[in-house]
Amino acid sequence: MNARVEHRGRLDEREVAAVLTVVEAATEADGVRPLNEHVMLHLRYGGDERAGAVLLYVGDDLAGYAHVDPTDPVEGPSGELVIHPAFRGQGHGRHLLEAVLDRTGGRLRLWAHGGHPGAEALALSTGFTKIRSLWQMRRSLFAAIPGFELPDGVRLRTFAPGSPDEEAWVALNAKAFAHHPEQGSWTLEDLKRREQEPWFDPAGFFLAERPTGSGDGDVADGGSTDGGPADSGSADGGAGEGGTGDGNRLIGFHWTKVHGDGGHGHEPIGEVYVVGVDPAEQGGGLGRSLTLAGLSHLRARGLAQVMLYVDESNTAAIRLYEKLGFTRWDVDVMYRK
């Protein structure tokens, strides 16, 4: 049966439901979700109007979907695609990828999640080269978790949705991940979208803060993210940039996440979702302490395992996580043409 390709800007509810069916079928077959969190949020809530979709139909059945993001003028367009397992091995992946390349003028950065051999074969056979690897690392939560101490004067508490914490976190996150645009470009709207997700739990979103006037720094540096604005300090420590509205200044954070049964095809698993630390605090062990606080929280929730994502090139972070008991589990690969 002949396949046909249709291009879309926004998908309607029926099309979104069909795409989610394809995604879940692929997740069940492969043991890894084929689309990253950003694309899934775009599907559910909409996103940048410049992003688009390519749908591949075989007869009346949706056989494949591609998300195309043309918003990076420097690195060029990026994309992710998925083929329903029932339609694999029939040339539909190549057909869909060629349609995406036609849309982007032949230039594309393509993510393949889980290092799937079929995705690698397709990418290499169509002239792509591998440019980036993102490790997934895991650790048992049954193993001992080291104790930790916070630096002098630092207080640890949890995030309060709908409060000045939101803008303070966005500010620190942007500086923390200034060289990681996927994470550092998050806006207040991006944060609020995640607050609406079923997995969001402020009890697992830890903030480290100092009273205003304590310490020197007002610039942030980054930690680790999932599948990464202006100053993080505030002159008065109130609800200004970096201030949390209670006379304190945000200097670090650890946002944890719990994936349910459907997310990874197995029992629920925790995630070190995002960690960020003010560079004025570096060398004092704050990042390590924040990480361990999150691990202790996830274990207290009864979880058996925790995962995180880290760029293969970030050897310092990999060494830190290895010292905390994490080992490599899987890899996501980016290809470019």
UniProtKB/Swiss-Prot annotation:
<feature type="binding site">
    <location>
        <position position="309"/>
    </location>
    <ligand>
        <name>1D-myo-inositol 2-(L-cysteinylamino)-2-deoxy-alpha-D-glucopyranoside</name>
    </ligand>
</feature>
<comment type="subunit">
    <text>Monomer.</text>
</comment>
<feature type="binding site">
    <location>
        <position position="37"/>
    </location>
    <ligand>
        <name>1D-myo-inositol 2-(L-cysteinylamino)-2-deoxy-alpha-D-glucopyranoside</name>
    </ligand>
</feature>
<feature type="binding site">
    <location>
        <position position="257"/>
    </location>
    <ligand>
        <name>1D-myo-inositol 2-(L-cysteinylamino)-2-deoxy-alpha-D-glucopyranoside</name>
    </ligand>
</feature>
<protein>
    <recommendedName>
        <fullName>Mycothiol acetyltransferase</fullName>
        <ecNumber>2.3.1.189</ecNumber>
    </recommendedName>
</protein>
<feature type="binding site">
    <location>
        <begin position="275"/>
        <end position="277"/>
    </location>
    <ligand>
        <name>acetyl-CoA 2</name>
    </ligand>
</feature>
<feature type="binding site">
    <location>
        <begin position="282"/>
        <end position="288"/>
    </location>
    <ligand>
        <name>acetyl-CoA 2</name>
    </ligand>
</feature>
<feature type="compositionally biased region" description="Gly residues">
    <location>
        <begin position="235"/>
        <end position="246"/>
    </location>
</feature>
<feature type="domain" description="N-acetyltransferase 2">
    <location>
        <begin position="154"/>
        <end position="337"/>
    </location>
</feature>
<dbReference type="Pfam" id="PF00583">
    <property type="entry name" value="Acetyltransf_1"/>
</dbReference>
<feature type="compositionally biased region" description="Low complexity">
    <location>
        <begin position="221"/>
        <end position="234"/>
    </location>
</feature>
<dbReference type="InterPro" id="IPR016181">
    <property type="entry name" value="Acyl_CoA_acyltransferase"/>
</dbReference>
<dbReference type="InterPro" id="IPR017813">
    <property type="entry name" value="Mycothiol_AcTrfase"/>
</dbReference>
<feature type="binding site">
    <location>
        <position position="182"/>
    </location>
    <ligand>
        <name>1D-myo-inositol 2-(L-cysteinylamino)-2-deoxy-alpha-D-glucopyranoside</name>
    </ligand>
</feature>
<feature type="binding site">
    <location>
        <position position="271"/>
    </location>
    <ligand>
        <name>1D-myo-inositol 2-(L-cysteinylamino)-2-deoxy-alpha-D-glucopyranoside</name>
    </ligand>
</feature>
<dbReference type="InterPro" id="IPR050680">
    <property type="entry name" value="YpeA/RimI_acetyltransf"/>
</dbReference>
<dbReference type="InterPro" id="IPR000182">
    <property type="entry name" value="GNAT_dom"/>
</dbReference>
<feature type="domain" description="N-acetyltransferase 1">
    <location>
        <begin position="11"/>
        <end position="151"/>
    </location>
</feature>
<keyword id="KW-0808">Transferase</keyword>
<feature type="binding site">
    <location>
        <begin position="81"/>
        <end position="83"/>
    </location>
    <ligand>
        <name>acetyl-CoA 1</name>
    </ligand>
</feature>
<dbReference type="GO" id="GO:0010125">
    <property type="term" value="P:mycothiol biosynthetic process"/>
</dbReference>
<keyword id="KW-0012">Acyltransferase</keyword>
<feature type="binding site">
    <location>
        <begin position="314"/>
        <end position="319"/>
    </location>
    <ligand>
        <name>acetyl-CoA 2</name>
    </ligand>
</feature>
<keyword id="KW-0677">Repeat</keyword>
<comment type="similarity">
    <text>Belongs to the acetyltransferase family. MshD subfamily.</text>
</comment>
<feature type="region of interest" description="Disordered">
    <location>
        <begin position="210"/>
        <end position="246"/>
    </location>
</feature>
<dbReference type="GO" id="GO:0035447">
    <property type="term" value="F:mycothiol synthase activity"/>
</dbReference>
<comment type="function">
    <text>Catalyzes the transfer of acetyl from acetyl-CoA to desacetylmycothiol (Cys-GlcN-Ins) to form mycothiol.</text>
</comment>
